[in-house]
Amino acid sequence: MEQYDVAIIGAGVCGANIARKLSQYELDVVLLEKEIDVSLGTSKANSGIVHGGFHDHISTLKARLELQGALMFDRLHEELDFPFERCGILVAALHEDEMRAIEQLYLQGVENGVIGIEMCSRERMLELEPKLNPDVVGGLYAPSGGILEPYRFVFSLVESARKNGVQVKTEFEVARAQRDGEFWQIQSKAGETVRARYVVNSAGLHADTISAAFGAEHFTIAPRKGEYYLLDRTTKAKPSRVIFPVPTEVSKGILVIPTVEGTVLIGPTASSAQDKEDFATTRDQLEHILHSARMMVPSISENDVITSFAGLRASYGNDFYIANSEKAPAFVQVAGIQSPGLTASPAIGEYVKDLLKKAGLRLVEKPSWDPYVHKVPRARDADPYTLDTLVAQDPAYGDIVCRCERVSEAEIVKAIRAGHTTLDGIKYYTRAQMGRCQGGFCTYKIIRILMRETGMSWDQITKHGGNSAILKGSL
């Protein structure tokens, strides 16, 4: 039976940051994930924003961790392999009566210590973003806000943790746990068992179920659905900064988000879901997204839409729940991590490390710890000279499999050899299947490469593991 100092349950953005942080110390750490790959829960379908630090008051844990986490992304971007850009955030007021809320956000941002935050006139808003509705009356500008690709961020964090000694076990769905002396004995639904002195519950939507399995606190995580539209990179409606409406008590509203890869996201909605596996989109909600987004950027066209999708966030109260359990020994709760969880996640890693130390975990720094990962060359980012060099080193760079996103066979092979053996895993690692045709032309090529590289037969290829087979029947 495998034995560890720390077991982290859940390989989303929080679990990945915690794993990487603990990899800096002389510890045996395992990261447990119920899905076939990491980043397939909440982390795969969110807005990809580094928030500005003005939406929540500094008295809340989420605001403090958001502010701390936001400052860490420049260093993380240098060390890891994910796209990131500090493009700034605008909050647009379309009516005079919304300016009072803008002033409150500004004062809260100043109190929180947000650098460079600015209340803006109509003229200043249109100078910062010419694509805004000309009826805008004013707003807020936070230059420190940014955008990133969330799944690539998680993949890179996990790669770094692995490189520094963390074990990663996918398809390990926790079924039960019991205390055995100084250890937790954790059994998966498939019957595999690991032992760990300390456990971190970062299971996202399922954190309540995991907490109950360990005899810790009883609470309920309510799934809250956010639906999005994705616009093609050719849209004329792409802003240069993230655009928020004035927030309501329910949510931060429908955003217009320029992505780091050149497309545009509009959304999300915020509706209650009954099922933690309900990722369906609805026509009513998508029409609401289009209407709301056009209020801020009128040039948005339905003709630019290439896909829609939904994500679920873990709703629990008005703040994060991150604490040592008062009921279960050596058990840390990391629950209720909704917006701005992505922004706060690097700081959550630091915070959980401190909680584990407080609980008795001995931390000795690892002299050999290396923060850097290899940055995979991307064909779409290469100039002709660089691409010629890449092709000379690996001819597979000359075979463009996904023409919409200019993804080469070499990149797909690297994704597979890094452990991403589903169509979704390859999509999130490389962006193949993410373009205008949504995989219409490249999926069959990717399936052939998967079969060649893994030895799987055609009927073993899945979209995201489990019962998501792509091809069925006989050929």
Where are these predicted regions, by residue range?
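Iron-sulfur (Fe-S) cluster-binding segments and ferredoxin-like electron-carrier domains
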Residues: E277, S408-G419, F441-W458
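Flavin-dependent oxidoreductases
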Residues: N17, A177-E182, I186-G267, S271-A280, ...
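Helical element adjacent to the flavin cofactor pocket in flavoenzyme catalytic cores
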Residues: L140-Y198
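Glycine-rich FAD pyrophosphate-binding loop
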Residues: Q24-K44
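C-terminal catalytic lobe of FAD-dependent flavoproteins
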Residues: S251, V260-E261, S272, E277-I400, ...
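Short beta-strand to alpha-helix junction loop
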Residues: R64-L67, A92-A101, L140-E159, F279-D284, ...
